[in-house]
A protein has these predicted regions:
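Thiamine diphosphate
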Residues: 1-143
């Protein structure tokens, strides 16, 4: 392991596919900072096709509890962040162990480039008559 601290940013949908790796991180006493973006589902898929499609939703786990689940005697610190003040508190915590930060986000909060990429991909795959053109399906950048 390099001497520098690792930062991991992962969405809740992706994390649910690989959550057990937190156990490996704890077993080897690695000390990354994990930012879990909890937006209730697969944001990239919502941008691509299906803003309101339920298949893009994932179950809401108690993510911040998982380090204790995988290793009950862990010294890892977990935080659920909903405000800037919460984030400041999490980032000010001693960093001598794994830090797990669950950041709650709006399900449709996406960078403009991601939204545009999703819209373009849907147009390429499905054309102008595709279901992505229904008004309730398309994500649009905030104005």
């Amino acid at each position: 392991m390099p001497d520098r601290r690792h930062l991991l940013f992962v969405g809740d949908g992706s994390f649910q596919l690989t959550a057990q790796e937190v156990s490996t991180i704890l077993r080897h006493d690695y000390k990354p900072v994990i930012f879990l973006i909890n937006n209730g589902g697969y944001l990239i898929e919502r941008c691509y096709l299906g803003k309101t499609s339920s298949f893009n939703d994932v179950a809401n786990w108690a993510y911040a509890d998982l380090p204790k689940v995988f290793r009950p005697d862990t010294t890892a610190r977990s935080f659920v962040v909903k405000t800037v003040a919460d984030l400041d508190k999490a980032l000010s915590a001693p960093n001598d162990t794994l830090i797990f930060i669950e950041a709650s986000m709006d399900p449709f909060d996406a960078p403009v480039a991601v939204i545009e990429s999703g819209n373009n991909g849907a147009d390429l795959d499905y054309g102008p008559r595709g279901p992505q053109h229904r008004s309730n399906m398309l994500l649009r950048p905030a104005t």
